[in-house]
Amino acid sequence: MKEVIITINGDDIADRIFSESAYAALARAKGGLPERFTDIVQATEDDRNLIERFIIESVNEAAGIISRYMSPCSATYMQTEENTGGTIYIRFAMPHNCPGSLAASLKESITSFAAAQSLQHWMLTVKTDEANIHLSKAQNDIARIRELLSSRTRPVMGTAEDENIIEL
């Protein structure tokens, strides 16, 4: 077993949520809605604490899924002064027959899932009819995470006599 630590910057996820909520507000403004209806959708720095809580919940959900496929998985959230959004560490043990690129792919999928799930929670608090769009994105990301965790590298037989020993 190989220990893997995935490090995710919480500010990156929060920035995605801020930009996507700004796009939603802009689309509403272009649709002719009054400013009071567009401002409510856009997340601001005042909403950061609530959004960080959504991010932590989403990452913990992803860690729970990893625990079903790998050894017990832990997600730790650490906030530092230079990083206002905090850093998230996800730690688990990976079998030897997992692809080497699994950790990088998992990091991207978990980051995408946390952003979509957190944005869905945000939309549920401000505009419930737009939350389903982000829910389907989060469900696709969860399916991708499960697919990544299920993948294994198959042993390859060598051509020479001494290469036909398979190590697991």
PLM regions and their residue ranges:
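Short, well-ordered alpha-helical segments in soluble proteins
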Residues: W122, V126, I142, R146-L149
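Short, hydrophobic/amphipathic alpha-helical patches that form generic packing surfaces
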Residues: N60, S109-T125
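Conserved short "hinge" loops at termini or chain/domain junctions
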Residues: M1-A103, K137, R144-L168
